[in-house]
Amino acid sequence: SDRTEEAFYYCISSINKSSPDYSLDQSNTSYAIEQIKAFLVAYPNSKYIEECNVMLDALRLKLARKDLEILKLYYNTDHYEACQIAAKNFFNEYAYSPLMPEAIYYLVLNNYEFAKKSVESKKAERYRACLDACNRLIINFEETKYTKEVNKIASDVKKQLEKYNNQ
């Protein structure tokens, strides 16, 4: 039928609307993404492509927000290594997310606290990991609301590393 495309579009639009807030289970969000991708494959020249891309972006942002909140939870509960793993996964999964600066910022805070609370034999290595995270934000994102604080942390980390380099 000549209305199949339109029916499929209204179906995915409805599935998209069933996607819950990021704080809830995201099974419906993942399903919506799958269905929108299926629509785009089935109808590559559809008049609904722009709307589908807007829906996809919003759904992906919701998944990224959920993963960022998990990363922040690990940081806030002093689960330093879990936060590092969550950050690595976030960077791999959402490389182009507008939430990337915030994710890097929390990795900086996490690594800074982790280094400060570490045993002496681990401090230099952990301060270097913190400095790497600082540089990742500073180099990849010119001006963010986190830049000033991250620059201060980077400055302190460099001072801490000088102590270990002079031993």
Show which residues each predicted segment covers.
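Acidic, polar-rich low-complexity tracts and alpha-helical solenoid repeat scaffolds
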Residues: 1-167
